[in-house]
A protein has these predicted regions:
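Structural signature for extended repeat/solenoid scaffolds and their inter-repeat hinge/linker regions
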Residues: 1-162, 167-170, 176
Length: 177
């Protein structure tokens, strides 16, 4: 087990990170370690670098200490998941990604799944099979809700509709008030 060190640019440009290895004693040595990802390639792939102080699992290619690889990160009592995901449950439905700033991509992995993207300020996109709706809401109280009842647009202040061409409104009944 290693601990990600303070950021230093990789002197060889190999996308490595400094990792302290406490197993080496009171003054743990640091190694440069490459970072394993589920998908990585030129100009594409996952990019989720651990933060300074995160616990990581370190392996060594062919047992060579010069070829360290961060294989994953670890949770513990001192390094718990973000609030919404801190408590495990038997159902294990709550999944997610939470960034350092609190931005979230979340999943409720139930029979009728829910997917959401949310910012710390309260802007949110919700895809909800349970409530059978798609909702876009913002921190100001504006919303766009699509569900079996139709489409509802709510503006906390003014509402402007602009088109470079024609605007057509049609329906069985139109109520403008």
């Amino acid at each position: 087990i290693g601990v990600v060190g303070v950021f230093e640019a990789d002197p060889d440009g190999e996308q490595r990170m400094r990792v302290l290895l406490p197993v080496l004693g009171e003054d743990p040595g640091a190694v440069w370690a490459r970072l394993a990802m589920p998908h990585a390639g030129t100009e594409h792939g996952f990019v989720f670098r651990p933060e300074t102080g995160d616990e990581v699992i370190v392996g060594f290619l062919d047992g060579d200490p010069r070829q360290a690889v961060i294989l994953g990160a670890l949770y513990s009592s001192a390094n718990a998941p973000a609030g919404d995901y801190a408590e495990a449950s038997e159902e294990n439905n709550d999944k997610g990604i939470v960034t350092r700033s609190g931005a979230k991509i979340g999943f409720v992995d139930a029979d009728r799944p829910v997917v959401f993207i949310e910012t710390p300020a309260g802007n949110r996109l919700l895809l909800d099979d349970d409530q059978e709706q798609l909702a876009l809401t913002d921190q100001h109280g504006n919303s766009l809700i699509l569900n079996a009842d139709g489409i509802a647009v709510t503006s906390a202040a003014d509402l402007a509709i602009e088109a470079s061409g024609e605007v057509r409104i049609s329906g069985q009944s139109i109520d403008l008030s």
